[in-house]
Amino acid sequence: MTRYQHLATLLAERIEQGLYRHGEKLPSVRSLSQEHGVSISTVQQAYQLLEQQQMIVPQPRSGYFVAPRKAQPPVPPMSRPVQRPVEITQWDQVLTMLDARYDKSIIPFGGGSPDVTQPSLKPIWRELSRAIQHNLTEVLNYDELAGRRELREQIARLMLDGGSVVTADDLVLTSGCHSALSLALLSVCQPGDIIAVESPCYYGTMQMLRGLGLKTIEIPTDPETGISIEALELALDQWPIKGVILVPNCNNPLGFIMPDARKRAVLNLAQRYDIVIFEDDIYGELATEYPRPRTIHSWDIDGRVMLCSSFTKTIAPGLRIGWIAPGRYYDKLLQMKYAASGTNVPSTQLAACNFIREGHYHRHVRRMRQIYQRNMEIYTCWLREFFPCGICVTRPKGGFMLWVELPEQVDMVCVAKQLCRLKIQAAPGSLFSAAGKYRNCVRINCALPPTEKHKAVMVKLGEAVKVAME
């Protein structure tokens, strides 16, 4: 975090604590500069950031004042999906989303990429170079099928933060969380099996289920507490469900952290109905609370929770490193990995291992938690300012996604097509539902820095939504 960001955070905390009251004049630029031992330009940048966040307002020749408090947009209500098994479609829309990744002229508000421009990632660049220069023969050869042991040992230590006690021998490395989840499903399911999912559910997971020939049943999900335990139990009574996919920590796209009591309740249901829990923890390290939230896997005593994660969101997607703790399905999963993809890339494993071992990983993740939290606050302010009344916005407890529910008459599928012509990519809510629900919703990627350029995009998005309401 830069000096001006640190100062802005400090001032924001003082405002939230009531030390500076709404309408009160803030200290002058010069006095703050002297108080904190920073330059005048640093104070000016901090005030500009707080102005962007609509926490303060400038008055000509008078200085800065604390802005009047504005009401937060309400949180969306619990989802109400169709509760019956369905086959997934919408591949064409997803393919359009994926193609936009490679077009540098498109602004990817609908994507899921993290911010890989931060200086705290410089050590991983050095480690990648070093891995190739000093281990040439090693990086050109096959690796262990389960993945490099040193990296598995480092990951096992990281998992302790989420309450999971495992050893390197309990883990299998993959080419990402998507790959880990796919292998987990292959190890347990047969084509035609039914898998329960949260609703809304990440579209990549939906398309994975489609590709494996599986049916899905969407379960109502609360944007603050997670999947409805009662609705899941009802579905388990009615249908031969094989397992449930959950993102309980910093959920994508809703951003909630499921309370511990509800995590244990889901695990109790899984034990009673003898189903598998496929736990996706890819965003868990990006929780704003500390210590980070526990995984469902941390309470598992009979190996029925298959925990999947990766460095895709915390370090960089280009590393292509994920992992899975497959529990009782270890042997089957290793067989599936050999059949599907074989071994991992040695060079990126070496680099990631050293990045963690030397302490760079924790420093980087701490930095990104703060940046993403501040980004989401700014984007929420922009939504309040540039979008019509009547919207609902999630209040994520981590990660970097916002889920926005718009008035019923807005069709974000049509709006997204119009924005595409303006070189703006949006992710309509219908992508996150097997039944095509949530057409009046949109997911926004707040990993994109809140620059003037991206502010202008939010203005255009708000204008397009207003036109769609006419």
Segment roles from a protein language model:
Residues 57-58, 166, 426:
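Short beta-strand "wing" residues that participate in macromolecule-binding interfaces
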